[in-house]
Amino acid sequence: MDELLSIVQKAVDEKKGERPLLYDFRELNPFIDHVVICSAPRVRQTHAIADNIKDRVRENGYEIRAMEGNSESRWVLVDLNSIVVHVFMNEERDHFQLEKLYADLPHEDFSL
């Protein structure tokens, strides 16, 4: 696993992200290598996870391309160029079902 993925994995784990999954997009998309999906039971925790990813990534010298979502968003997207992280509230994750959309892609549990 590359360094940036390890940083993201640890950042999600530190804030108790639930059901983390890692999808391999390298065969499908020339712009991103991986997509990470995780969730949390509350909006506050959702944002804590996203903020921790942002902080840990920057601490290690990597750039954040973009973060989408405001303080009340139930879905926050963190774009790290080669990795895109979706942090959902549990209900939003169940509603949008990205796992079904990505079902044919190689994926694995991203828990520590």
Q: PLM features: what roles do these ranges have?
A:
Residues 1-31, 41-76, 90-94, 98-112:
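Polybasic/polar functional segments that serve as interface/processing modules
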Residues 33-35:
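Short, aliphatic-rich beta-strand segments
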Residues 37-39:
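Short hydrophobic/aromatic beta-strand micro-patches
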Residues 78-81:
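Active-site beta-strand termini and strand-to-loop segments that position acidic
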